[in-house]
Swiss-Prot record:
Residues 128-156, 165-186, 200-234, 291-312 have a biased composition (Basic and acidic residues). One of the essential components for the initiation of protein synthesis. Protects formylmethionyl-tRNA from spontaneous hydrolysis and promotes its binding to the 30S ribosomal subunits. Also involved in the hydrolysis of GTP during the formation of the 70S ribosomal complex. This is Translation initiation factor IF-2. One of its GO terms (molecular function) is translation initiation factor activity. Residues 128-352 are annotated as: Disordered. Residues 595-597 are annotated as: G5. Keywords: Cytoplasm, GTP-binding, Initiation factor, Nucleotide-binding, Protein biosynthesis. Residues 503-506 are annotated as: G3. It holds the Pfam family IF-2. HAMAP family: IF_2_B. The keyword Protein biosynthesis applies. The lineage of its organism: Bacteria, Bacillati, Bacillota, Bacilli, Lactobacillales. Residues 457-464 are annotated as: G1.
Length: 950
């Protein structure tokens, strides 16, 4: 056995990782299960050689792949160059005859395509011959492509021609052709073909316009004469209302209203002439604007001539004439469908109204209960009026801002053919889900985090001294009597890696965290004094660690003491289920012998912690919003609520909105374990925080929210739920309600914690209780120890829902207060058979006495008075029964019980009284409750003892 080595020792000597050594050893067929397994020297050499050989093989393989890649790169590049030859000065640099033949075939194909296109050009261009020349052989490939693109663009223009292009082509046709170079001949020869066709159509339009003008002038002249004879006062009676509706144009003030009919006829002619081509569209606003202005000027001149022929003065008559035209134009606009705008264009009546853009309906829609019509219309891209109309046809009258129920929303969506999907509302106040789910974490951003280590052990076994040596500070000297007075969290750095330590007095925080489902500890260091051995709190620490499921590292301390015996400590620990790795390689614990006082083997202990942490592969994502657990909390008179937090995921920053347990706030200050202020804290970092609205409890979770509004809403919601749960919470198991709980099937075993004055009494009591036989029920001894009932016993009983039996011992003052707060049942006895009889009687449901609640009075709060240093006094009026000083009271607000407690004081006017009768006024204070408001109801009751039926 002396020549054997453990895997972790080989890793230290060679610098290789434990994982590689274990994997290589297993591949070689050696019996190796973990880094703690032992191998012979010969096997160790084979394992090291195997790891190095594997590494060299991988390196050689990579080198071969790199060489092969370098050989393949030139061939690939060469093939790409052959497929796409480079061109210099318009000539393709190609030497391969196959590629030359391919280029030749492409040029011949282009020639054939141009030859096929020539007959089309002859049909369109009847006046000019074809000028295009075939592509020469010496012409480069790029030039041929450019020529082909130009020809395609010109042919595309032949199909769609705008009226603006028609006017331009008329001017181009009249001019002489300029002298062009050979490069531009092809593009110029294509244009006249299209221009000749368009010019013919433009000439036809001009002839039609010229033919229509004389009739129009004659009609205008007769119309003006008739209007002047009627003195401009009679409405137009010529029966051409349609002409009015189309001819009323306020741009042309001197134009008669009856001209609209002829104008409409001309528009029809335009449409008929333009309909010869299916693809061309004529736009009157573009081509006839200038001509219309010329015609208007001629009309004005003709009106002046008419005035002279009538032998009347020009001034007044022109005014009347203009007024008549304006009046007729206004009348025509009344009949026009397009509206009566002042600058309405008469040609716009033929333009169709712009239709609303059509939006396709979504396949499905995720809706919320309470959505209104406007929200649904916006989601499915429809008008609210359309949805309101549908609902009206279904028999439901709503407006667009009215909230709809679930059935109505689904009915509307199904009517449109949209699948309704109810939105699952996420409970943002439930921060506990963040500790169970990890879907919000980014796997690519996960980094290694420091291990969180809890130091546990018996009193005065050297826990704080050990942590003091780790931190290289003098924490122990500052504590009263050398005993830890508070829970601390500290961080140290060793071998380039950080370790976070939790120092716990009596392990309350550890048990409290486990009771609330929090798991913050990764590793437990169990400190045992080599001279004292295993003590009661040592066994308690072992039970806590196993219940939490964290690995244990045993540190046998005080080797410098004369009576130190590490072998005896190891033997005693094995009796409680803690075995060394040498004895149990799979489930064993690491044992390290140290002396914290003389700094002996502390480096080995830290290396062991890092080794266990490496095996666990602890990782966290620092990029998300921070979550973590409360280690300690207290109320400071100057700073307010102060909480010691441990960040588990993400990064916590100053001014972050945060929810801690049932309270909320904004991070005001953050202090690290050295008392220095910091601006951010990453994973596994302990910090002390201020800025909370109330003091949280140890073990509560915290989470950072996106803004303060969301944090406030979540905190208030959590506080409301906690208060509701507290009211509805069933009573803890005690001897009074044990039988009822057993009948309801809520308990299959009775958990008991035994504390006695001597070890023999504790063992005898445990054996006697386990012999009690009740059908379907068994007694489970959670913990048995010697000494007074402490706070740690109360915490353990609260976590395991156990009953504490004290035999010849009493609870401490703090333990008694905590038991009342945690509602833990404590039974104190000095005779064993009475303990057995009481437990057996409780299990059979025959425990006396039994109490019944009796309501004796009811009162309503009329006024409240806040007295400094005293509290809130409620002035009340008794409406039924009476209020007595020795009774209990429930505070009811809006039908909900918000507090249940005793009456602290009772007064009638200024006198202290024992009771206040019906229809009388008085004042009272409720014990430990000051949130009394006007109109609250006091329900006064007493617990009356009754005899239990046997």
């Amino acid at each position: 056995m002396s020549d054997k080595k453990r895997i972790n020792q080989i890793a230290k000597e060679t610098g290789l990782s434990n994982t590689e050594l274990v994997a290589t050893a297993q591949s070689l067929g050696f019996e190796v299960k973990s880094h703690s397994s032992s191998v012979t020297a010969e096997q160790a050499e084979k394992i090291i050689q195997g790891v190095k050989t594997g590494t060299d093989t991988i390196v050689n393989l990579l080198k071969k792949l790199l060489k092969l890649k370098l050989r393949l790169v030139p061939e690939t590049a060469k093939s790409k160059q052959e497929d796409h030859p480079r061109t210099f000065a318009g000539k393709a640099v190609v030497e391969d005859p196959a590629i030359l033949a391919r280029i030749k075939e492409k040029e011949e194909a282009k020639k054939a395509a141009k030859t096929e296109a020539e007959p089309i050009e002859e049909v369109i261009t009847t006046e000019k011959p074809k000028v295009a020349e075939p592509v020469k052989k010496s012409e480069p490939k790029a030039a041929a492509k450019a020529e082909e693109t130009k020809v395609e663009k010109v042919e595309a223009k032949a199909n769609t021609v705008t009226p603006k292009a028609e006017v331009k082509t008329e001017n181009v046709a009249d001019k002489k052709e300029p002298v062009v170079t050979e490069e531009k001949k092809k593009s110029l020869t294509q244009k006249p073909r299209i221009q000749i066709k368009v010019i013919k159509r433009a000439e036809d339009i001009k002839k039609e316009q010229a033919a229509a003008r004389p009739e129009k002038k004659k009609f205008d002249k007769n119309r003006n004469d008739r209007n002047n004879r009627n003195d401009n006062r009679r409405p137009n009676q010529n029966g051409n209302g349609q002409g009015h509706s189309q001819g009323g144009n306020h741009y042309d003030k001197n134009r008669p209203a009856g001209q609209g009919q002829n104008q409409g006829q001309k528009r029809d002619k335009f449409a008929s002439s333009g309909s010869s081509s299916t693809s061309d569209t004529f736009t009157p606003a573009a081509s006839g604007k200038n001509n219309r202005r010329d015609r208007d000027r001629k009309k004005t001149d003709s009106n002046r001539d008419n005035t002279k022929d009538g032998n009347r003065k020009g001034g007044p008559l022109r005014v009347n004439d203009n007024r008549n035209q304006v009046r007729n134009a206004r009348n025509s606009n009344w009949n026009q469908k397009g509206g009566r705008g002042r600058y309405q264009n008469n040609q716009s009546s033929n333009v169709p109204a712009t239709q609303r853009k059509f939006h396709e309906l979504p396949e499905s829609l995720e809706y919320e209960v309470g959505m209104n019509v406007q929200d649904i219309a916006k989601s499915i891209k429809r008008e609210p009026a359309e949805i309101i109309k549908k609902l009206f046809m279904m028999g439901t009258m709503v407006n667009q801002n009215q909230s709809l129920d679930e059935d109505t929303i689904e009915l509307i969506l199904m009517d449109y053919g949209v699948t309704p999907l109810k939105k699952v509302e996420e409970d943002k106040s439930d921060i506990e889900r963040l500790f169970v789910e990890d879907g919000y974490l980014n796997e690519d951003k996960m980094v290694e985090r420091p291990a969180v280590v809890t130091i546990m052990g018996h009193v005065d076994h050297g826990k704080t001294t050990l942590l003091d040596r780790f931190r290289e500070s003098r924490v122990t000297e500052g504590e009263a009597g050398g005993i830890t007075q508070h829970i601390g969290a500290y961080q140290i750095k060793t071998n380039g890696k950080k370790i976070t330590f939790l120092d716990t007095p009596g392990h309350e925080a550890f048990t409290s965290m486990r009771a609330r489902g929090a798991s913050v500890t990764d590793i437990t260091i169990l400190v045992v004094a080599a001279d004292d051995g295993v003590m009661p709190q040592t066994i308690e620490a072992i039970n806590h660690s196993k219940a939490a499921g964290v690995p244990i590292i045993v540190a046998i301390n005080k080797l410098d003491k004369p009576g130190a015996n590490p072998q005896r400590v190891t033997q005693e620990l094995t009796e409680h289920g803690v075995f060394p790795v040498a004895w149990d390689p799979e489930n064993g614990s690491e044992f390290v012998e140290i002396s914290a006082k003389f700094n002996q083997n502390l480096e080995d202990l830290l290396d062991t912690v890092l080794l266990v942490a490496e095996v666990q592969e602890l990782k966290a994502d620092p990029s998300v919003r921070a979550i973590g657990t409360v280690v300690e909390a207290r109320l400071d008179q100057g700073k307010g609520a102060i909480a010691t937090l441990l960040v588990q995921q993400g990064t916590l920053h100053i001014q972050d909105p945060i929810v801690v347990g049932n309270t909320y706030g904004r991070v005001r200050t953050m202090t690290n374990d050295l008392g220095r202020r910091i601006k951010e804290a990453g994973p596994s970092t302990p910090i002390e925080l201020t800025g909370l609205s109330d003091v949280p409890q140890a073990g509560d979770h915290f989470a950072v929210f996106e803004d303060e509004k969301a944090a406030r809403a979540a905190g208030e919601e959590r506080a409301k739920r906690a208060q509701l749960i507290k009211r509805q919470n069933t009573r803890r198991v005690n001897l009074d309600n044990l039988f009822d709980t057993l009948k309801e099937g809520q308990t299959k075993s009775v958990n008991i914690i035994i504390k006695a004055d001597v070890q023999g009494s504790a063992e005898a009591l445990a054996a006697s209780l386990q012999k009690i036989e009740v059908e379907g029920v068994k007694v489970d001894i959670v913990h048995s120890a010697v000494g007074a009932i402490s706070e740690s016993d109360i915490s353990l009983a609260a976590a395991s829902n156990a009953i504490i039996i004290g035999f010849n011992v009493r609870p401490t003052g703090l333990a008694r207060e905590q038991a009342a707060q945690e509602e833990v049942d404590i039974r104190l006895h000095s005779i064993i058979y009475k303990v057995i009889e009481e437990v057996e009687t409780a299990m059979h449901g025959m425990l006396d006495p039994e109490f019944k609640e009796e309501i004796i009075g009811e009162a309503i709060v009329r006024e409240t008075f806040n007295v400094s240093k005293v509290g809130t006094i409620a002035g009340f009026m008794v409406i039924r029964g009476k209020v007595t000083r020795d009774a209990s009271v429930r505070v009811i607000r809006e039908g909900v019980v918000i507090h249940d407690g005793a009456i602290a004081s009772l007064k009638h006017f200024k006198d202290d009284v024992k009771e206040v009768g019906n229809a009388q006024e008085g004042g009272l204070m409720v014990e430990d409750f000051n949130d009394v408001e006007i109109d609250d109801t006091f329900e006064v009751y007493k617990m009356v003892e009754i005899e239990r039926k046997k």
